[in-house]
Every structure is written in structure tokens, then in C-alpha cells.
């Protein structure tokens, strides 16, 4: 709602209700035979059904979930309750507008004290960060004060119903932190300014998905290019709450692309020293020169992307671009350049097409292992040892993400591309070499830059080199 400028709750007596485009959308959404929505909206509708609230979608007889590899992340987001500084300010403002100025002032003071209790010792944090919640005596006292005020606010006369609901939700969330409820993963999310958001993630996402979507017994089809990790669907089945369902029908469509002829997989020669940013920049320069530009360089970290990009400055004559978050305009400029070099991270790992020769060199700087956070810390504790956790969770997630990034290389049957993975752990003889190869289609590999040059000469037309 907040992303489309719709209030958290719409009063039933709103005089614009009949003309409101959002309300009209809700009415129209009950009419069509085929309904299209994103994952979050689907899960919100499922939540409404379980709670006997008004439906967001018409009752359906079949469900098709595209890009289903993203559904677990959407579910984690939907099943995580949060209370941010903005939410706190909004509650105080709503109380003030309801003519409870003194009460709003008390609540604002209590919220500030609670936030302060979570920001002590933050000098070591750099940028955004998440930390597991620890219930200190200071935080306990601050939580008790906030909960008491929220509870008292719920008993005030003439408070609008939607505000009562918001106050009740905030009280319930803070109680989770006070009681340290074991079915919730409690952590503090700090923004770039160090302001804390209280987050309570569910530790039962697969079970919640099972109740929300699969126990309806309606037929469901889940599609994606990366549902399987190294050809195995079991990890995705576990994340989606489908592991207990039998029989499940699996179908794998072979790629129409001739990777053995049209793709060359390059690993840098193995050396004893670790590849730091300077050595990585030198390797990127060699590859870009060998392929005459036409390069996409994918990073897992925006910070590393910026540092390596700076080290390559002035090392080639090809137009060079750097895509930050929301970098659609920069990506379009790269596509129009013809032979440019694009440094990118984040969303460029998937969902963006680079057909033709514009990406004839795909460089993957690091294997895309998931970034540790309080939720992954909780998951790790569910395994008897670290090795079992890495094999069961971390490697399959890396393989699916690696396959998504690899998919930027060849988008049509006429495309050809060199894919270079610079992470020494993925190289020949590296710790994760076999895991990386298992995630990718079979194609020839090399450690020689001369093979890269020859591949480009054989695959590309003369106008490619102009």
C-alpha cells in the first residue's frame, strides 16, 4: 500500500471511495477469468483467505507461479513483521491528529528511548547492517514502557478503528521481542543512518507456504529457469514447503542453445596468492582487450564493484558504465553503445536481456554465495555442523544464483559468449570447482587467454571488431 500512496487502512465512510482508483481496482479484480499478480500479492490474498478476510483475488481453480525460485524470498518478506522509526513516527502523528497530543508526546519519548537502547555501540557498523536481537536490561525496560503505552492507547475513547488496529499490531510485535518467542527470528535492521527497525521473521516459512497455497488442493504449476540446483529440485521443494507432497511431477526442458559450440568457460590460471581487487582488475583488463569490449562484469558487492571499476579506469578505449541500484538508464546506454563495458550488481544477475553481441564477454567476479544475516544464522543452528549446512543450504543457493548470472550470456540461438569466473574457489582445482560446473551447462573450459582470443575470432563477424 505504501508504494502506491494508499493509506494503511481506508475508512469505509471516505467520501472519495466510489471514485478511488485503488478501490475500483479491488472491485475490478473480482471480475476477470485470468488474474495476474506478483508473488507478494498472491501471498497476501492467501493470508486473507486463511483469516476469512475479504479476498484480493477471485477464487481460482488453477495456480501458475512463474519465476517460482523467488517465492521463498517473497514469503520471507511477507511473513516478517517490522516496526521502523517511520512506523513509530506515524503512530505518534495519528494519535496527535486524533487529539491526543500529550499521549502522542509520551509515546514518542518511549519510542526514542527504545531506539536509543538499540543504537549503543554502533560505531563498528558500516552502512546497512542486521544484528540478532539481544534482550538487555535497558531494552527490556524500554520495551515494557512502549508496550504499556500502546496498550493504554488502545483503551482511549474515540480512537479510529484503523488506528486501534495499528496500535495493536505494534504492541503484538514488541511483545515478541520482550518474550523472545522461539518461533520467531528476532533481529534489528539498521539503515544507512544507524536507525533501527525491529524485525520478527517466521522460522516456519515452508509450513506457512504449505498452509497458504498447497493445502488448498488446487493444481499448481511452478516454473523457473533455476528451480533446480545442479539438476536437483529437493532444495527448492524444502524451501517451498513441498517436500512432504507426493507425487510431485518434475519436468526439465533442455536448453535450445548449443553451449558446447557457442560458449567458452574461462578460469584464471591457478596461483598460490589470493586474488585481490588489483589482480582482479588486471584480469578484467586482459579479458576485455581479448574480447574487444562487449562485456558485462557482475559483482556480488557494490563496494567491490566501485573499487575494481576505479582500478580499471583508463585501461581501455571502450565506453564504460557502472550500474547502481535502479540503474535502468545506464543499462540502456550500455545496450546502445555497441561495444561497451558494464559493471553491475544486484538486479543485473537476472531478468535483464542482453541479446546479440552486446554481451560477448560475461565476467563473474565472485561466486554468488548468499550474504549471512540473522535468518541464515538461525538456519545454520538447525544443522549438526557447518559442513552439513553449507552442503544443504549455501551451495544450492549459490548454484541457482550462478545459473541466473550465467543466463545473461546467451539469449538467442545465434549468440556466442565467453564466460569468465574469476573466483579462485571456482577455478580448476578450487574448493567449489565441481559445484560451479554442476550448476552450468556443459561447455568447453580453458585457463588460457589465447583460447579466449581465438574463440572470439572464430565466432564473431568482421563488423564486431570495428
Regions found by a protein language model. Name each.
Residues 1-466:
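ASCE RecA-like P-loop NTPase motor cores
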Amino acid at each position: 500500500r505504501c508504494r502506491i500512496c494508499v493509506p494503511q487502512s481506508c475508512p469505509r465512510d471516505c467520501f472519495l471511495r466510489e471514485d478511488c482508483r485503488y478501490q475500483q481496482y479491488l472491485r475490478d479484480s473480482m471480475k476477470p477469468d485470468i488474474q495476474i499478480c506478483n508473488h507478494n500479492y498472491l501471498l497476501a490474498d492467501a493470508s486473507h483467505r486463511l483469516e476469512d478476510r475479504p479476498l484480493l483475488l477471485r477464487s481460482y481453480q488453477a495456480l501458475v507461479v512463474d519465476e517460482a525460485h523467488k517465492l521463498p524470498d517473497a514469503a520471507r518478506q511477507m511473513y516478517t513483521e517490522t516496526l521502523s522509526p517511520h512506523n513509530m513516527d506515524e503512530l505518534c502523528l495519528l494519535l496527535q491528529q486524533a487529539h491526543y497530543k500529550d499521549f502522542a508526546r509520551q509515546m514518542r519519548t518511549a519510542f526514542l528511548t527504545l531506539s536509543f537502547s538499540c543504537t549503543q555501540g554502533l560505531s563498528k557498523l558500516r552502512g546497512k547492517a542486521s544484528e540478532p536481537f539481544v534482550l538487555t536490561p535497558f531494552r527490556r525496560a524500554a520495551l515494557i514502557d512502549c508496550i504499556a503505552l500502546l496498550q493504554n492507547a488502545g483503551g482511549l475513547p474515540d480512537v479510529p478503528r484503523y488506528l486501534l488496529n495499528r496500535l495493536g499490531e505494534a504492541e503484538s510485535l514488541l511483545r515478541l521481542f520482550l518474550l523472545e518467542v522461539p518461533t520467531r527470528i528476532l533481529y534489528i535492521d539498521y539503515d544507512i543512518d544507524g536507525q533501527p527497525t525491529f524485525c520478527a521473521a517466521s522460522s516456519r516459512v515452508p509450513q506457512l507456504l504449505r498452509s497458504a497455497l498447497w493445502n488448498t488442493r488446487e493444481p499448481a504449476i511452478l516454473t523457473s529457469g533455476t528451480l533446480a540446483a545442479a539438476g536437483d529440485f529437493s532444495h527448492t521443494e524444502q524451501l517451498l514447503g513441498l517436500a512432504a507432497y507426493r507425487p510431485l511431477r518434475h519436468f526439465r526442458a533442455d536448453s535450445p542453445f548449443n553451449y558446447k559450440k557457442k560458449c567458452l568457460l574461462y578460469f584464471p590460471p591457478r596461483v598460490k596468492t589470493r586474488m585481490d581487487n588489483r589482480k582482479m582488475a588486471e584480469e578484467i583488463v586482459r579479458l576485455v582487450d581479448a574480447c574487444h569490449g562487449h562485456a558485462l562484469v557482475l559483482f556480488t558487492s557494490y563496494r567491490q564493484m566501485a573499487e575494481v571499476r576505479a582500478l580499471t579506469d583508463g585501461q581501455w578505449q571502450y565506453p564504460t558504465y557502472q550500474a547502481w541500484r535502479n540503474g535502468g538508464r545506464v543499462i540502456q546506454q550500455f545496450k546502445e553503445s555497441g561495444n561497451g563495458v558494464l559493471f553491475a550488481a544486484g538486479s543485473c544477475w537476472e531478468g535483464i536481456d542482453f541479446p546479440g553481441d552486446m554481451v560477448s564477454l560475461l565476467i563473474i567476479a565472485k561466486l554468488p554465495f548468499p550474504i549471512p544475516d540473522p535468518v541464515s544464522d538461525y538456519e545454520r543452528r538447525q544443522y549438526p555442523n557447518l559442513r552439513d549446512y553449507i552442503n544443504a543450504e549455501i551451495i544450492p543457493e549459490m548454484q541457482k544464483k550462478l545459473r541466473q548470472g550465467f543466463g545473461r550470456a546467451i539469449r538467442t540461438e545465434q549468440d556466442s559468449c565467453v564466460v569468465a569466473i574469476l573466483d579462485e574457489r571456482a577455478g580448476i582445482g578450487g574448493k567449489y570447482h565441481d559445484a560451479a560446473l554442476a550448476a552450468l551447462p556443459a561447455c568447453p573450459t580453458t585457463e588460457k587467454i589465447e583460447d579466449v582470443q581465438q574463440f572470439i575470432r572464430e565466432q564473431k563477424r568482421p563488423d564486431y571488431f570495428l
